[in-house]
């Protein structure tokens, strides 16, 4: 019979050093890989493998049948979900929103994809973003964000009828050019060829103008040119597909210029003029309107005018279950309800007598807004630093929260007590959402793709807000502990070989003692010769 004591006595300290060193090395490699995988994908690799591969293999055919049924239901619902998402947000570039993955709930229904939308309140590159760069030497926009804008501009401002028109071919290249000075130079070249090239004026207003007043002046010139081109193409739009495409392009150019002019009026303090222009634009029907979300510009202007009754009317029209939600819609609804009770709200009094009906309605509106986008309160309460918003946003993501808070923080400050009410109640939302990635309360579960998309949209110097806050998986903690313990054992064995050898033998003796005791008890209860007697029978 194998003698364990003889085996242990023959082991040298070098064996223990090699054993613990090898174990420490393997544990360290596993730890590094787990940490890298967690940082990139937000989950543990070992946990994913055990859940997705080992568990179904252990469960057998039942797990496989459930998996096949689940995939069938999700694929059948995926087509309808993608078609609905396309209608709501459009395709990449052409409709101003690009898909970046989808998620499937535990019930088999597919949630809408994470889409990147144009920021309705995007700033001017020359008059605003460029001045930030001069002041801080930090790039406020990412290449990914600017590339999406280039795709949008190509889709909005070009068409098949531009073939063999040198000025429009120059502008097609200009939108894709990374160097801003080269883009401006190309726009001037296009205007030298054709003084009625409206897209060239748009580029100059966006990037060459160093003030809002300069941008407004260029856009007014562009508006005159765009109206002339619009009337020309309107008269010939029925002469074929190419003529119809040119008319759509001229319509997009005209609406875009009017929108930017209204935004200039808003920035220059001409609020009534801006509100009228935004109202007129919301009555337009072309497909570009679903991308620009001009009603959000109108809401922000009305809040600046403190025309709260008009804001109520806009929300009644756009805060509908069939329309895509936004932080502007949800948080403006919460602000208007908070306005009725915020000035008299006191958490101490409310804890004693309870919430009134109006206060309960305001708190529920805040919880609804926080569920839609949980990143906004940190910026409104100024616990996190604001930066310039990107040109594109991800709904329910940190980019949308930045864009909303950048323009709406002052509106919350104008309403006395609104920020205090938000501060006292917003964290209560998370008690209703213990598993926000799996089940929502009023909206779909929170999408898991927001963090990756926001990192592409937001500059590197900004710390992206993550929800829900990720905790280190058990496997990473376990591997880190195992690696540390084995490394310490290897070091101690190398420094003190004989004491560590005695310690190892003592530990093994302690571990084997219960089994030895159990063996003796069994032998006392069940004699060894019993089996021999049974075999004779």
UniProtKB/Swiss-Prot annotation:
Chain segments carrying region Disordered: 61-111
Membrane topology is: Multi-pass membrane protein
What keywords tag this UniProt record?
Answer: Membrane, Transmembrane, Transmembrane helix
Indicate whether Membrane appears among the record's keywords.
yes
Give the main location: membrane
One GO cellular component from the entry? membrane
Disulphide bridges:
none
Q: Which residues cross the membrane?
A: 15-35, 472-492
- Composition-biased stretches, type Low complexity, lie in 67-84, 100-109
Localization, UniProt: Membrane
Which InterPro entries does this entry report, sorted A to Z? ST7
Q: Return the Pfam families for the record.
A: ST7
Q: Does the keyword Repeat apply?
A: no
Family (UniProt) = Belongs to the ST7 family.
Q: Which PANTHER family match?
A: PROTEIN ST7 HOMOLOG, SUPPRESSION OF TUMORIGENICITY 7
The name under which this protein is listed is Protein ST7 homolog
Read off the lineage from the record.
Answer: Eukaryota, Metazoa, Ecdysozoa, Arthropoda, Hexapoda
């Amino acid at each position: 019979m194998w003698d364990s004591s003889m085996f242990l006595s023959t082991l040298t300290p070098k064996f223990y050093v090699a054993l613990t060193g090898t174990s420490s090395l393997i544990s360290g490699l596993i730890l590094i890989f787990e940490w890298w995988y967690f940082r990139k994908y937000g989950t543990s690799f070992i946990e994913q493998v055990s859940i997705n591969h080992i568990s179904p293999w252990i469960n057998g055919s039942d797990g496989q049948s459930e998996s096949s049924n689940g995939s069938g239901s999700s694929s059948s619902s995926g087509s309808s979900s993608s078609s609905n998402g396309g209608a709501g947000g459009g395709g990449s570039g052409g409709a101003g929103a690009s898909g970046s993955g989808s998620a499937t709930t535990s019930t088999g229904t597919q949630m809408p994809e994470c889409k990147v939308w144009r920021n309705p309140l995007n700033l001017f590159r020359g008059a605003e973003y460029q001045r930030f760069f001069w002041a801080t030497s930090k790039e406020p926009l990412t290449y990914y964000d600017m590339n999406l804008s280039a795709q949008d501009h190509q889709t909005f401002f070009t068409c098949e009828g531009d073939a063999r028109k040198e000025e429009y071919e120059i502008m097609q290249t200009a939108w894709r050019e990374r160097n801003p000075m080269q883009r401006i130079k190309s726009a001037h070249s296009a205007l030298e060829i054709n003084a009625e090239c409206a897209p060239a004026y748009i580029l100059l207003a966006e990037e060459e103008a160093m003030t809002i007043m300069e941008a407004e002046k260029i856009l007014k010139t562009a508006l005159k040119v765009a109206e002339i081109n619009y009337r020309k193409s309107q008269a010939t739009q029925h002469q074929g597909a190419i003529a119809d495409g040119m008319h759509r392009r001229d319509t997009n150019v005209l609406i875009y210029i009017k929108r930017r002019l209204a935004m200039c009026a808003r920035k220059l303090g001409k609020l009534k003029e801006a509100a009228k222009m935004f109202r007129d634009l919301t009555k337009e029907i072309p497909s570009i309107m679903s991308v620009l979300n001009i009603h959000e510009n109108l809401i922000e202007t009305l809040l600046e005018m403190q025309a709260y009754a008009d804001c109520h009317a806009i929300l009644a029209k756009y805060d509908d279950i069939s329309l895509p939600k936004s932080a502007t819609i949800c948080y403006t609804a919460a602000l208007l309800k908070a306005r009725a009770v915020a000035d008299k709200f006191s958490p101490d009094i409310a804890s004693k007598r309870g919430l009134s009906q109006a206060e309960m309605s305001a708190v529920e509106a805040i919880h609804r807004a926080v569920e839609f986008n949980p990143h906004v309160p940190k910026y409104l309460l100024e616990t996190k630093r604001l930066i310039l918003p990107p040109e594109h946003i991800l709904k329910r993501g940190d980019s949308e929260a930045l864009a909303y808070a950048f323009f709406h923080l002052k509106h919350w400050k104008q309403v006395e007590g609104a920020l205090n009410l938000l501060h006292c109640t917003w964290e209560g939302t998370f008690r209703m959402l213990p598993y926000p990635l799996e089940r929502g309360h009023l909206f779909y579960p929170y999408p898991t793709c927001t963090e990756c998309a926001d990192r592409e949209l937001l500059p590197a110097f900004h710390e992206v807000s993550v929800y829900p806050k990720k905790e280190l998986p058990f496997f990473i903690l376990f591997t880190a502990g195992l690696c540390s313990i084995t490394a310490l054992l290897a070091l101690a064995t190398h420094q003190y070989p004989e004491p560590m050898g005695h310690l190892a033998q003592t530990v093994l003796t302690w571990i084997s003692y219960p089994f030895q005791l159990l063996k003796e008890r069994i032998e006392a209860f069940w004699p060894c010769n019993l089996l021999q007697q049974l075999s004779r029978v």
